């Protein structure tokens, strides 16, 4: 019995009509593919089935994908990125049926899938034996997500396989939000980069652990914590130890870092002795930066963060000062990425 007085079987069966809506939303996305994208996703699916790597757009950032069930293909992801082998990958799916083949789904996790998929929510659940240990980073759990772009969904659907995909860049660097950045960084060592334009959100997915009685936020991201709490009508907790945190990618190693130092500060707190610096934020700073990028709000700040970091590292400035946002809504994910980019 769950805390609402219903059995898990009842909760699952009551939600069955909503499954079609997930499929309909995914189908509607895929229907928007251009003829060129159809051709490229067919080619990409062939590469995935053959054990190769394909870079593709999601609504969050560009992903570097491989067959999640092929340990050797997954190994190529780690090698291409220079990614630590104990940093797990997210499994991207195109249907609930595919998800059920990979992980054990409880009724609360199913509710979140029905509410937010396709979308920027990754859910950590007990993994089934079919998922290789290498894909899981050696953990008993796996994170699953249904991405919300036509290209990503079509690539998964046409390959007939779940696709393991971290961000399509060298590990530790700012995540790519356009195809040109992917090509510049790893385009010469992978067979295909599918261009889907700029990503819609610009930050990675929210990762929620649903293995216990209470949901736990492992990584803030494109879906605010408050939205998950509203859907479940319960508090989303924060992780209490490193063992749980490591169930999510992007939480234990330095990530998103530009090639010049990044410091976090308030707009009016730039050191008076600062020279040859760049600014990033929603407000105008004191002093005279070499270059500044001002965003209209935190949503735009989040969407353009990684692109802005790459722009400023090439500006000739010696250091970047960035405004630290309030820790609510998308600001929570933005603060997380800035803190990690600064080495925190």
Q: Which sequence ranges carry the predicted segments?
A:
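Active-site-adjacent structural elements in enzyme catalytic cores
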Residues: 2-344
